[in-house]
């Protein structure tokens, strides 16, 4: 993978994770983060430039979907789950 495409992929990966962390709903947030990490790990050994470009284009579309869903989730927020309200144990 060329240096520029590697940097582009890393920027896209970080942007997707950053945007996913903005989900208000715990289940959506954890699912999106897990799915992004799994997808990038699964495709990390792809060498074909055409396939890499197709995956980058798909990731860009997915980033747009994540942004839209985060925005919709913020408009129609719900109460936090019990798991989100737990305090972290003190050391």
Swiss-Prot record:
Q: Which domain of life is it from?
A: Eukaryota
Recorded GO cellular component terms are: L-cysteine desulfurase complex; mitochondrial [2Fe-2S] assembly complex; mitochondrion; nuclear body
Q: Which InterPro entries match?
A: Complex1_LYR_dom (IPR008011), Complex1_LYR_LYRM4 (IPR045297), ISC_assembly_LYR (IPR051522)
Which positions does UniProt annotate for pantetheine 4'-phosphate binding?
6, 44
Where is this chain primarily localised? mitochondrion
Secretion signal span: none
What processes in GO biological process is this protein linked to?
[2Fe-2S] cluster assembly; [4Fe-4S] cluster assembly; iron-sulfur cluster assembly
User: Has the keyword Nucleus been applied to this entry?
Assistant: yes
Task: Enumerate the UniProt keywords alphabetically.
Answer: Mitochondrion, Nucleus, Transit peptide
* Family affiliation: Belongs to the complex I LYR family.
Q: What does this protein do?
A: Stabilizing factor, of the core iron-sulfur cluster (ISC) assembly complex, that regulates, in association with NDUFAB1, the stability and the cysteine desulfurase activity of NFS1 and participates in the [2Fe-2S] clusters assembly on the scaffolding protein ISCU. The core iron-sulfur cluster (ISC) assembly complex is involved in the de novo synthesis of a [2Fe-2S] cluster, the first step of the mitochondrial iron-sulfur protein biogenesis.
PANTHER family found in the cross-reference section = LYR MOTIF-CONTAINING PROTEIN 4, PROTEIN C6ORF149
Name of the protein in question: LYR motif-containing protein 4
Phylogenetic classification of the source organism: Eukaryota, Metazoa, Chordata, Craniata, Vertebrata
């Amino acid at each position: 993978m060329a240096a520029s495409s590697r940097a582009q992929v890393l920027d896209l990966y970080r942007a997707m994770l950053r945007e996913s962390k903005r989900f208000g709903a715990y289940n959506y947030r954890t699912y999106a983060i897990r799915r992004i990490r799994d997808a990038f790990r699964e495709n990390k050994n792809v060498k074909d430039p055409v396939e890499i470009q197709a995956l980058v284009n798909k990731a860009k579309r997915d980033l747009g979907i994540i942004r839209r869903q985060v925005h919709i989730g913020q408009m129609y927020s719900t109460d936090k789950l019990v798991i989100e309200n737990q305090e972290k144990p003190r050391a």
